């Protein structure tokens, strides 16, 4: 009796699933265009992870990026494979992986090249707090 309880998996904590923000992997130019069009005219911060499947530092940053997406639910997190979407990577002048581009209102507002978790988090926090003061309407 009780065996069903011992084999059941614990439910995720609040906010771990179904939140407004999660990493959205973009696998086509059409999907990129759709997502970019949805965000480029807003004040929402967008963090784009340009990576490659063969890139060791990119793999190291993947769980960090997912964890940040779970915490920063007011930020959009997109993941682009540079081999899959080379045209998008060229548009954003990506030359090394991982490259994290932070954008708001269709413009780049920050960039971190390399697997620098602390710098990425610091930059996201800085830009998140600056959006609350710049997001006021007249």
Swiss-Prot record:
Residue(s) at site: Contributes to redox potential value: 56-57
Keyword field contains Cytoplasm: yes
Active site, per annotation: 55 (nucleophile), 58 (nucleophile)
Alphabetically ordered keywords of this record: Cytoplasm, Disulfide bond, Electron transport, Redox-active center, Transport
Record-linked Gene3D superfamilies: Glutaredoxin
GO cellular component: cytoplasm
Family statement drawn from the similarity comment of this UniProt entry: Belongs to the thioredoxin family. Plant H-type subfamily.
Residue numbers spanned by region Disordered: 1-20
PROSITE patterns, A to Z: THIOREDOXIN_1, THIOREDOXIN_2
This protein's name: Thioredoxin H2-1
């Amino acid at each position: 009796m009780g065996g069903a309880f011992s084999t059941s998996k614990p439910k995720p904590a609040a906010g771990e699933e179904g939140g407004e923000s999660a990493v959205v992997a973009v696998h086509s130019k059409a999907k990129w265009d759709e997502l970019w069009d949805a965000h480029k005219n807003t004040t929402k911060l967008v963090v784009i992870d340009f990576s490659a499947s063969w890139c060791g530092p990119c793999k190291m940053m993947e769980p960090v990026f997912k964890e940040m997406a779970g915490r920063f639910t007011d930020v959009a997190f997109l993941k682009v494979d540079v081999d899959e979407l080379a045209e998008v990577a060229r548009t954003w002048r990506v030359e090394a992986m991982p490259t994290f581009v932070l954008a708001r209102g269709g413009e780049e507002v920050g960039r971190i090249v390399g697997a620098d978790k602390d710098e990425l988090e610091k930059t996201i926090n800085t830009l998140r707090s600056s959006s609350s003061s710049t997001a006021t309407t007249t």
